[in-house]
Amino acid sequence: MKTAKRLISITGMRDILQRRIPVMSLDSTSPGPLVWLTACIHGDEVGGTAIVHDVFAALRATALLRGAVHAFPLINSMGFENVSRFINTDREDLNRCFPGDAHGSMGEQIARRLFDTITKSQPDLVIDIHNDWVRSVPYALVEPGAEHSSQEIHQQVLRMARSTNLLLVEDSDVLHSLHNTLAGALINAGIPAFTIEAGGAFAIVEESVLAGRDAVLAVLQCLDMIEYPKARNTHNGAAVPLKYTNQPLCTSSGLIRFEVSPGEAIKRKQALARVYSAFGSCEETLRATAPGYVLGLEDHARVLPGRQVIAIAELP
């Protein structure tokens, strides 16, 4: 088994500032699938980096039986240094810049370099690891299949995402253009990819890191790349993905107090949270629009009209 660590350049500003990001590789030297792991595409989502570290540590301890695993453990070095989701002062979201443009904005240039590096290696699967709100549960997030890929690729993605044993959720094109996310752009290029949302950002939460590590190892086991004990994640075994929604949104401003917890099953019209004025009067009650599970809750108590304050996986 061969291991390697290297740095690749991601910007073309050689005369001013050259940025490089780390790449980790582990090769069994036996034929098999190639899996890429990507993490910290948003600079404040450091838990994903820890998950990559722990996955590689586990693989070195248990041995990779076949194939290879490559990883970008810390993509957004600029955001990481500034504890920011974005890559620069223009507040570019790197995960809305794919597949990128070699002559575009800084975000588009970085995205192009990353995208080309991954696609040229012809991987069998890419797992993009993110972190959500501080109060959130880990889940596997897949792109809507009908619009972005062939049925064959979509079924591969579902099979791999389901093998994580995490809550399985389908993203929504209504919220943003999924064509410009890393996973969406890869699927459009014919490469199976999905996202793992593993707990809160900003800090490394060991419980979330463990869940994320086990989810990735469960996928590798499904691909017959390792022999690993059954994963501890057993949240959802639904054959059909649940639907991601950011509803209900706030229509008033004030202080929000939640009446549900991440991971909790909810019913239609159930009270999820109430918004209070500075005098303590209830200005608004937010209710579930459909049955499902709570994925995460807003980090801040202050809310404004039109703001997303909760993430829910609705039952189909």
Question: How should these model regions be labeled?
Answer:
Residues 1-316:
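Structured catalytic-domain cores with a bias toward divalent-metal coordination
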